[in-house]
């Protein structure tokens, strides 16, 4: 049905006629996500009439048809004006049961199809319109959602109702800094959402920070997985800055409680590998946000039959994380978004937990045996990570190098041994460690263990490439001294030309291990010499 005919029927005001016309329009456009520009004005007019119609006393079937039409029309971000004003948002919020006032003792818990349709429409409108986001802030929709979230354990709302409540809460906190702060601070969102997470997962506790995890339990259901992921995403929005500030004892206990739940999430499977990967990805993203001091609960559970044990500690979580890292490395897709969170988590955990670092080092940097191939060649975890050290994306390159550097206890010679000086130079230059030494981290003084293969090959390993190179003939063999001098001067002139044309900039390593342009170093040396000469003359 074309919008013109539909407009005529809407303007008639007859509920039965309008309901049938909208139902036909909705069926025809249910899968329409792209709209032509020619009928944009008609769609805007249709939106205005439907919103006005919703303010009348309507039969449920007519309400439903109107809300479905709004959901479809709100997919077009160029025709949203009928839905972004205060009156329109308020109307949809009322249908969704989100109208909020301080005087309300209990929020309404709508559980019908109309409420879900209103929530879907609000999600589209909020996502596509900055103006609508501002109106949502003024109407305090976050408060309405938070109040309803508190009652989920006491009510039997449908999955769809809960899911779109959570989806709308995620969108509001993702798109508005003010609403993010409001949920986090005024409404104590971390505690609220942690309770919702615990309830959705139906957790049982064996200790204060230890969830009972049944290894034989079936995969997490599709609906529960969807809701849990929305909760994890919203928690990520409101916790992204807590790792950079001090937390008091009460907050630390809350974050430890949350970390224990996230440990359980990492050990749970969902229906299908891709779903499990996505679920674990959201879990890792949130773990990165939590204060490091609160991540000790990842290792505290008792070692049980079937657990991965190392140095008397339960390493189930770390084992899952290293497998997750390996899969992300193999996928090689959107590395900054998919890889840097888990690398950062493993790096920072390795800094503060000795057992974690030693376990990861045994997995990633086992005693070196392969000295014939470059460190970046091969399919081991070490090979894959070393390849990333020269990646075009600076964040990816830095995260991979930092992780390996920490596993080497920030020891330069050990780092070069496992990665090759050519791959390591970027991090060493940034840290001022090109001259050798150690980073600023504090680690135990245990010795690196060399294999027999490495000890035998060590004198022949090229430190730049990190492997044993075939001996190459000396290109200067058979040259006279005059020929050698000629070739040397030719090389000097080539470098001089490249330098003067600013194609390259010759650099040197300073006494503090940093790179410095050679002309600056020469100038400083000349100034020191002149100063020394002046002092000699005065004497």
From Swiss-Prot:
GO cellular component: cell cortex; cytoplasm; plasma membrane
Subcellular location: Cytoplasm, Cell cortex; Cytoplasm
Keywords: Chaperone, Cytoplasm, Guanine-nucleotide releasing factor
InterPro entries found in the cross-reference section: ARM-like, ARM-type_fold, Chaperone_Ric-8_A/B, Gua_nucleotide_exch_fac_Ric8
GO MF annotation list: G-protein alpha-subunit binding; guanyl-nucleotide exchange factor activity; protein folding chaperone
Stretch forming the signal peptide: none
Gene Ontology biological-process annotations: G protein-coupled receptor signaling pathway
Predominant cellular place of this UniProt entry's protein: cytoplasm
Function: Chaperone that specifically binds and folds nascent G alpha proteins prior to G protein heterotrimer formation, promoting their stability and activity: folds GNAI1, GNAO1, GNA13 and GNAQ. Does not fold G(s) G-alpha proteins GNAS nor GNAL. Also acts as a guanine nucleotide exchange factor (GEF) for G alpha proteins by stimulating exchange of bound GDP for free GTP.
Family statement drawn from the similarity comment of this UniProt entry: Belongs to the synembryn family.
Name of this protein: Chaperone Ric-8A
Species assigned in the record: Xenopus tropicalis (Western clawed frog)
